[in-house]
Amino acid sequence: MTIALGKFTKEENDLFDIMDDWLRRDRFVFVGWSGLLLFPCAYFALGGWFTGTTFVTSWYTHGLASSYLEGCNFLTAAVSTPANSLAHSLLLLWGPEAQGDLTRWCQLGGLWTFVALHGAFGLIGFMLRQFELARSVQLRPYNAIAFSGPIAVFVSVFLIYPLGQSGWFFAPSFGVAAIFRFILFFQGFHNWTLNPFHMMGVAGVLGAALLCAIHGATVENTLFEDGDGANTFRAFNPTQAEETYSMVTANRFWSQIFGVAFSNKRWLHFFMLFVPVTGLWMSALGVVGLALNLRAYDFVSQEIRAAEDPEFETFYTKNILLNEGIRAWMAAQDQPHENLIFPEEVLPRGNAL
């Protein structure tokens, strides 16, 4: 019996090894295996968005002008969602709707599904890029884990929410004013601001901004350079080998301010990671709930009392009336294909009126 010792060696010209060597080579812009997903998808998503906002109308899907060619500016231009009648069709260029006609495909809203799907895979490719680079230089993968927060929000808002509704029509269009319209829609039809998952998301994002500002200011406050005292600008010298700020001084400062302070850098920075990412995850979970039409908090007793007593009104009941107003006024404007008509007497008014 023959026993072979050592590693099994492949042929030198193995195609996988050649590709791996080229993709992961040290260059100015790292490509990597993740780049095979990231770069094409990012290119097509951005290219589709610039094309749509420059040339493509939303007249056939929303009855709106949405391109620079029609007179919109950066804040009002958008790549709009497909018509409600198209439901959840992928709207492939070669599909039964467009039948290979590029003009018809753009008119039907095909660019929206094109941008949304390529954008989602582009974001996933960027997260995989962070995993791949972290593995290459032997780092932990927390950057990629952190980036899962924005991905979760994007996928939940642009893909899962409209999948739970009647079609892509109810997703946000890709534009600044279009996103604002979608926020108003979320408030009017889902009372989103009173949703506990939205509250957790706001706490996470604003809390992270506060932590970031405090952390940056504290590090700047305690910069030092050995032998030169507290000289902020000399401490920026990148050739200094030692640590450039004093954790001990920072701890003493915040202990006096709040009575408590972080004494461990790892816990401090994990907390700065945990707060925003958890907030984004919670927001994404909330939007998934809205896709299923789960309700936010309802304080029915206040609504009943406000209906019975003209002198009783709370900020909650006023907001509920505002939501009714948004629904009544917005539905007719936002869904012209439904031919909704609300007579004046059914439009909501506050108790003062």
Swiss-Prot record:
Compartments it resides in: Plastid, Chloroplast thylakoid membrane
Q: How does it sit in the membrane?
A: Multi-pass membrane protein
Q: Where does chlorophyll a ChlzD2 bind?
A: H118
Query: Which amino acids does the record list as binding Fe cation?
Result: H215, H269
Q: Which GO terms describe its biological process?
A: photosynthetic electron transport in photosystem II
**Could you list the residue ranges that cross the membrane?**
41-61, 125-141, 153-166, 208-228, 279-295
Gene3D superfamilies associated with the record: Photosystem II protein D1-like
Q: Which residues are involved in binding pheophytin a?
A: Q130, N143
Add the further remark from the entry. Answer: 2 of the reaction center chlorophylls (ChlD1 and ChlD2) are entirely coordinated by water.
Q: Which family does it belong to?
A: Belongs to the reaction center PufL/M/PsbA/D family.
Instruction: Supply the name of the protein.
Output: Photosystem II D2 protein
Gene name in the database record: psbD
